[in-house]
Amino acid sequence: MSAVTGTFRIVSEEEQALRTKLERLTTKDHGPVFGRCQQIPPHTLQKAKDELNETEEQREAAVKALRELVQERAGSEDVCKAVAEKMQGKDDSFFLRFIRARKFDVHRAYDLLKGYVNFRQQYPELFDNLTPEAVRSTIEAGYPGILASRDKYGRVVMLFNIENWDYEEITFDEILRAYCVILEKLLENEETQINGFCIIENFKGFTMQQASGIKPSELKKMVDMLQDSFPARFKAVHFIHQPWYFTTTYNVVKPFLKSKLLERVFVHGEELESFYQEIDADILPADFGGNLPKYDGKATAEQLFGPRIEAEDTAL
């Protein structure tokens, strides 16, 4: 008889209880969306351990290793030199975002740092004078929106309601600039780093004029933002109420999507039963088929930046 070998670890009752809790979470089990995380919930720490290979010892070792890798690679290629320059003065919490986004694989975290810097070099128009005040009016208009409550998985839910979007009044680039500011701001929160984001795109009222007005290059820029350019875990993208000609726009996007993100795209149309199984109607505004009042972008901007007169004015 051949010997059976392997490594076995006794799972504590506390750990098992946390894993059981993870299977039946509600929106009330998570911390606030806005502001820094005061304390990571125990079940979220367990999730980080199970999904991201995170432990207290690993955090310290991985940050140290990533810092060293940044310096080691600084003299190799231009983007590596740019990474080293961009990372000067960054604290451990900044590096930890990238490590968590790549499940504590330090080399993949470094590649993400390169993507983060390269995206800024590739699309400088998105980052020119990029301050909270520069994008505030776009966010107040709801492009994009952010729910005040996390979903049951602890993810931040971002909204886009295309019906009233005038792409001549608010350009595609202005919306992407708003996304960039929002992502930087929300990723200061450790719960968000671990649990990630969910995006809901409401295409009710999407016109053929809007469809023809969006350039393929703009769609690619959006996909580049979602893939390998931010230390963010994009866990799901839901499209609802899309008309038949939405397929044309989506077919332009699909070739740019990597298989991992493509698997996380859900196109619901008018059949929303599975959508509401994932996203509780009690956290959704009325204009997204939920039980809350209509979405208020001005309230969101205040949550992000404070009142207008006190808003930050620091370039990212």
UniProtKB/Swiss-Prot annotation:
GO BP term (any one): visual perception
Subcellular location: Cytoplasm
Entry-linked Gene3D superfamilies: Alpha-tocopherol transfer (1.20.5.1200), CRAL-TRIO lipid binding domain (3.40.525.10), N-terminal domain of phosphatidylinositol transfer protein sec14p (1.10.8.20)
Keyword Cell membrane annotated: no
Gene Ontology CC terms: centrosome; cytosol; nucleoplasm
Highest taxon above the source species: Eukaryota
Ranges where the CRAL-TRIO domain occurs: 135-296
SMART domains in UniProt: CRAL_TRIO_N, SEC14
Annotated CDD domains: SEC14
Residues bearing the modification N-acetylserine: S2
InterPro entries: CRAL-TRIO_dom, CRAL-TRIO_dom_sf, CRAL/TRIO_N_dom, CRAL/TRIO_N_dom_sf
Record GO terms (molecular function): 11-cis retinal binding; phosphatidylinositol bisphosphate binding; retinol binding
Pfam families: CRAL_TRIO (PF00650), CRAL_TRIO_N (PF03765)
Positions with a binding annotation for 11-cis-retinal: Y179, E201
Main location: cytoplasm
Ranges in a coiled coil: 45-72
UniProt keyword annotations, A-Z: Acetylation, Coiled coil, Cytoplasm, Retinol-binding, Sensory transduction, Transport, Vision
Task performed by this protein: Soluble retinoid carrier essential the proper function of both rod and cone photoreceptors. Participates in the regeneration of active 11-cis-retinol and 11-cis-retinaldehyde, from the inactive 11-trans products of the rhodopsin photocycle and in the de novo synthesis of these retinoids from 11-trans metabolic precursors. The cycling of retinoids between photoreceptor and adjacent pigment epithelium cells is known as the 'visual cycle'.
Quaternary context: Interacts with DEGS1; the interaction increases synthesis of chromophore-precursors by DEGS1.
Full protein name: Retinaldehyde-binding protein 1
